């Protein structure tokens, strides 16, 4: 999650997102649509975090915009998606004198006039590996996409997944993507779901209150597992849903807290430590694989998948 005031990016090139594949042949051979989202194994999500940590360690301790660690992170995610049958595209831009990249992955099939997107920023700050901020969201979105492939899910709507660059500089990559879309293509996005910091070590369970239908979908999931939620306010407008919302796209998302302190009332209902930040390692060098609450990561990964399945049916 970004801390600074939004910056401005200048695009130097953009690789056009591949045209959506026609669905007729796929529909003929498609298996029956699954009735509900499958469980997302948290061990798989954590395995992606281990890879992102290794990438940061091998590249100066971070995965920041314009640094080798960011491009290596993007290459890792892209390779997994390509092998799983996604149509991927890299979108290039510049910010602060450095080249940045977005990664877009489309799952073949579904109604191209009704696109459900799930995304997260892949970059870290320069001071650390960014495993909670935002390896957690990036890894969960990746594993949800891979689960779509493993189950050969054939939704009614078209599914698109995204990993954004330079969020920490002010949602630069996601803003560049939104601005690159025609008015017609923006209107085709029926919902954008954002996942930024979903494994905080002293977690809360926060739901964006932007689009009512998306908000209700997430709340329904958490109600079903007996976990109370609160409306997200700490990061309001400070992550990659903001450019989509400004463009009129319905948005929603999940968050487990950053530098704000957990109150006594929150600790009573969620556990954890009152008077301590949700993430004491926010934007710090200690944001490593030891800075993750597995229970929060597991619940939010499953909530992510639930929303993708429910909203794309």
What would you call each of these model-derived segments?
Residues 44-47, 51, 68-88, 136-143, ...:
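Extracytoplasmic/secreted proteins, especially bacterial periplasmic and envelope-associated proteins
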Residues 105, 118-171, 304:
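Alpha-helical metal-binding/catalytic segments enriched in His/Glu/Asp
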């Amino acid at each position: 999650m970004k801390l600074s005031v939004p910056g401005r990016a200048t695009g130097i090139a953009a690789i056009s997102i591949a045209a959506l594949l026609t669905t007729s042949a796929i529909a003929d051979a498609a298996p029956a649509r699954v009735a509900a989202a499958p469980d997302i194994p948290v061990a798989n999500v954590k395995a992606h975090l281990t890879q992102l940590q290794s990438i940061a360690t091998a590249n100066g301790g971070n995965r920041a915009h314009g640094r080798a660690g960011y491009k290596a992170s993007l290459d890792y995610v892209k390779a997994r998606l390509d092998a799983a049958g996604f149509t991927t595209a890299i979108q290039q831009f510049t910010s602060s004198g450095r080249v940045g990249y977005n990664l877009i992955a489309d799952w073949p099939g579904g109604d191209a006039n009704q696109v459900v997107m799930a995304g997260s920023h892949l970059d870290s700050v320069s001071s650390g590996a960014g495993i909670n901020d935002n390896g957690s969201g990036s890894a969960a979105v990746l594993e949800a996409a891979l689960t779509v492939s493993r189950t050969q899910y054939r939704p009614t709507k078209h599914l698109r997944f995204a990993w954004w660059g330079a969020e920490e500089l002010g949602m630069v990559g996601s803003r560049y993507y939104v601005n690159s879309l025609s008015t017609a293509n923006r209107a085709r996005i029926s919902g954008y779901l954002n996942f930024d910091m979903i494994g905080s070590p002293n977690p809360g369970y926060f739901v964006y209150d932007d689009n009512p239908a998306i908000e209700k979908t997430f709340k329904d999931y958490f109600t079903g597992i007996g976990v109370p939620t609160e409306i997200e306010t700490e990061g309001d407008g400070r992550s990659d849903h903001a450019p989509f919302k400004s463009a009129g796209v319905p948005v929603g998302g999940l968050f487990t807290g950053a530098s704000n302190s957990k109150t006594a009332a929150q600790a009573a209902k969620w556990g954890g430590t009152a008077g301590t930040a949700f993430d004491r390692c926010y934007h710090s060098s200690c944001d490593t694989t030891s800075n993750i609450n597995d229970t929060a990561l597991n619940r939010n990964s499953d909530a992510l998948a639930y929303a993708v399945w429910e909203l794309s049916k």
